[in-house]
Amino acid sequence: MAKEVECKVAIDPCLIASLPDVISRTLGDSPLTPVEKYDVYYGRKGKEAEFRIRKDGTTVVVTRKQKEERADGVEVNCEIEFHVSEGDVHAFFTSLGYIPLIEKRKVGSMWRDGNLTVELVHVKGLGDYLEMELLLADDANESELKNALNRLATLRLRFGVADLPLEGRYYNDMLRDIEK
């Protein structure tokens, strides 16, 4: 299990062309990697999504997030993840009474620098987003959390997006809202 500290910002299309260069210069040696993720969120009928199955290239990962409610637009989650083979994963969970509730597709670019992941992605149905995520140990203390929050704020400043509001909602909630 790991604790992730993440923030995301909706990006205006006029910034999309220049942002990859800004991110690459800021992160130095971190290579830009294409990213394409397909997520299916599962839950019980009439209930909230309980977990997701993500296909990222040839990798399939099941993730459950224990979410911490915050008012500052930053997500702090403890994640439980495990890798599976694609074969019967859908059939397995539907046999337990879970159904697919929401689908999400993200396409874009990713940079990694140690425990930091930065993604500039287009989320189908929602638009373009800059995501920044720091992974901490699941037993990270308040000081480590505060340092992570400060680092994310500094990165937003260096990327030139500090004045843009943080999007505190989860993508699956945003997608569910537009389906209503």
Positions of PLM-derived features:
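N-terminal strand-loop-strand beta-hairpin
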Residues: 1-115, 159-180
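Mixed-charge, glycine-accented linear interaction segment located at domain edges/termini
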Residues: 141-169
